[in-house]
Amino acid sequence: MQNVEFASLIVMAVAIALLPFAAMVVTSYTKIVVVLGLLRNALGVQQVPPNMVLNGIAMIVSCFVMAPVGMEAMQRAHVQINAQGGTNITQVMPLLDAARDPFREFLNKHTNAREKAFFMRSAQQLWPPAKAAQLKDDDLIVLAPAFTLTELTSAFRIGFLLYLAFIVIDLVIANLLMALGLSQVTPSNVAIPFKLLLFVVMDGWSVLIHGLVNTYR
């Protein structure tokens, strides 16, 4: 009995230690923070907003996006606890199984089918045949990397559109400086105020955050 409780304690400790990592790769955090980083680079202001602010914005928006999933997980865990008549260290695994289903549903909804198929094929090639035969495309071991890859692809597509909008300003400013004979002036330094002005006039923060949130409808 003590060995079982010790093993369950180890499993719970490992699960708690992996929570920050899981919060980054199996939530909306990855896409949001990458898009915000690409936006900062596109604007040409390398240190503003600072990394702490970007991470804070990404965490807050991710908490909003993931709130229904988290609440559903807590509700199912509560139902499991009531069914067990309480909980102790030996009943952690059934509790985790009940709580992970909402996350599986979220990942499955927002994961590209092509990426899931890739990891399923890779498992057939890399895993032992007996283990690969038991694998399903909605298992977390498949969904987690497929979701992360889907999010990164989506983030870079959004980043490309952001860069495309601001690079036009860079080109216009560079041509104007050359026409005025000011070739020694760095175009990027002159373009930054105009980029910021365009971003403010277009209500850029609201448009970008609203767009990111709406990708998870």
UniProtKB/Swiss-Prot annotation:
Pfam families attached to this UniProt entry: FliP
The organism's place on the tree of life at top rank: Bacteria
Predominant location: membrane
GO biological process: protein secretion; symbiont-mediated perturbation of host programmed cell death
Keywords: Cell membrane, Hypersensitive response elicitation, Membrane, Plasmid, Transmembrane, Transmembrane helix
Summary of the function given for this chain in its UniProt record: Involved in the secretion of PopA, a proteinaceous elicitor of the hypersensitivity response in plants.
NCBIfam families assigned: PRK12797.1, yscR
Family: Belongs to the FliP/MopC/SpaP family.
Protein name according to UniProt: Hypersensitivity response secretion protein HrcR
Organism: Ralstonia nicotianae (strain ATCC BAA-1114 / GMI1000) (Ralstonia solanacearum)
Gene that this sequence comes from: hrcR
